[in-house]
């Protein structure tokens, strides 16, 4: 919840479509993402669900961002997972839910 509360307004300010954030807020697959956002989302979900990615996902990511970009995205995913684990264990309170309320669990 902390990361959602902090990053929701930043995502809006960076140009993420409100519809994308609304979908995420209720646990729906975001439908209004750009091609790059969608590729990053697919890559991230695959890493989180399977602890790796298939050859097609990897090839698409390398084609978009290069090998360095794929390493950076993977490191970013790992960093945020680790931060969230620590914050969950420490029961870090969110600084207040963004508009739309707290993030719902994503169906997995």
Which residue stretches match the model-derived regions?
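Hydrophobic alpha-helical segments
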Residues: 1-108
